[in-house]
Amino acid sequence: MTTILQINSAARSQGAQSTLLANELTAKLQQSNPGAKVVVRDLLADALPHLDESVLGAFFTPADKRTAEQNAIVAKSDALIAELQAADVIVIGAPMYNFGISSQLKTYFDWIARAGVTFRYTENGPEGLIKGKKVHVVTARGGKYAGTPNDSQTPYLRTFLGFVGMTDVNFIFAEGLNLGPDAQSAALAGAREAIAAA
């Protein structure tokens, strides 16, 4: 059975275009995979704490020397990673905020990037350990940035996902959403065409 993991990272709980379009893509993937299991990870509703000394300390303390608090922190990270590893297809709703990703998504990445667990260092360089996944990134943007130097979001996402082993990444852009009604309609129509083709 196919498992689809949808990760919503918008800072708004209602009306975020990246979430709405990610919902549409997940529904389309369900139609293409009858019986698929869908898991939704809402990074706003289930917020993760930003990295701090206690979190980093837990990650870098050997298992046999962790405190109860550190074990709880690592268990949370392990659960997020297990959820990711169990998915066959991953849909990420990723709005562009100030040329990058939301702090919610960055924090999620910080909680799943663990040496020896989701990547490892070898004599030939780092190797990602989350392999065999198809990833769709649905990004919503107020302006038009794709293919320009101002799009630091796309290369960052491709780099991070590739670093942990997810190299089959498809980007769906909804750009120009704040450039007026006509531009918004065109952006959403273009994104929906890409969703239909995914």
Curated annotation (Swiss-Prot):
* Residues where FMN binds: M96, Y97, N98, F99
Q: Which family does it belong to?
A: Belongs to the azoreductase type 1 family.
Top-rank taxon of the source lineage equals Bacteria
Q: Which reaction does it catalyse?
A: 2 a quinone + NADH + H(+) = 2 a 1,4-benzosemiquinone + NAD(+); N,N-dimethyl-1,4-phenylenediamine + anthranilate + 2 NAD(+) = 2-(4-dimethylaminophenyl)diazenylbenzoate + 2 NADH + 2 H(+)
Class of this enzyme: oxidoreductase
**Keyword set for this entry?**
Flavoprotein, FMN, NAD, Oxidoreductase
Which gene underlies this protein? azoR6
Query: What role does this protein play?
Result: Quinone reductase that provides resistance to thiol-specific stress caused by electrophilic quinones. Also exhibits azoreductase activity. Catalyzes the reductive cleavage of the azo bond in aromatic azo compounds to the corresponding amines.
GO molecular function per UniProt: electron transfer activity; FMN binding; oxidoreductase activity, acting on NAD(P)H as acceptor; oxidoreductase activity, acting on NAD(P)H, quinone or similar compound as acceptor
Q: What is its EC number?
A: 1.6.5.-, 1.7.1.17
Does the UniProt entry include the keyword RNA-binding? no
Q: How does it assemble?
A: Homodimer.
This protein is called FMN-dependent NADH:quinone oxidoreductase 6
Q: Which organism is it from?
A: Burkholderia lata (strain ATCC 17760 / DSM 23089 / LMG 22485 / NCIMB 9086 / R18194 / 383)
